[in-house]
Amino acid sequence: MEPLSLTVYDRNIWHLFKKEEGAPQAMFPTNIKYIFEDDDDVADVDDLVFQQQQPDSELENVIIVEIDGAGQLENVELISDQYEMLSYRRERPVSLASQRSLSWLTSGNDTGGDAGKKSGDISDPAAGPDVPREAPLSIELELVSEFKDYRNLNLEDLKLDELTRIFCIQNKQLQMISDALN
């Protein structure tokens, strides 16, 4: 099974009003369980809960990622009461061999005893054997969480064009959710 990287972004406009460092809207799902089409050992959703969690705990959000036998992304589905999926996209980063080549180019010290070596040659002993491998499949999901009550915010401080932009973003999200339901 090829490694998988899953990143979830909450595109709720509420994050535009928060003044936090970093990216509070980015989430990295945990409690991941691989289920294969021919698995008979997963009887129900309760089997997906980590043993370290409380036995009576419930899963809140389930992301189903369908990948074919060749490792190609077929579909992503979200089951949640708190989030609606806006979109997903597959990202395949540069292969590991290419990453080594790029790092050799950027850190290149071409003036050593390797005068015959071309820039970007990855036969460098420190780089290890040049075995071309694919980088992990990377999937990014864009979700929107429940809309918040904005009455507590001081919206009078915002300019009209900023309020219009926020209104347009939220309308676009609502339209995407509506289209997905049809």
Swiss-Prot record:
GO terms for biological process: autophagy of mitochondrion; chromosome segregation; karyogamy; piecemeal microautophagy of the nucleus; protein transport. The keyword Secreted does not apply. InterPro entries: Atg31 (IPR018621). Transmembrane segments: none annotated. Residues 105-134 are annotated as: Disordered. The keyword DNA damage does not apply. It is found in: Cytoplasm, Cytoskeleton; Preautophagosomal structure. Keywords: Autophagy, Chromosome partition, Cytoplasm, Cytoskeleton, Karyogamy, Microtubule, Protein transport, Transport. One of its GO terms (cellular component) is phagophore assembly site. It holds the Pfam family ATG31. It comes from the Eukaryota. Plays a role in starvation-induced autophagy. Involved in mitophagy. Functions with ATG17 and ATG29 at the preautophagosomal structure (PAS) in order to form normal autophagosomes under starvation conditions. May be involved in microtubule function, such as chromosome segregation and karyogamy. This is Autophagy-related protein 31. It comes from Candida glabrata (strain ATCC 2001 / BCRC 20586 / JCM 3761 / NBRC 0622 / NRRL Y-65 / CBS 138).
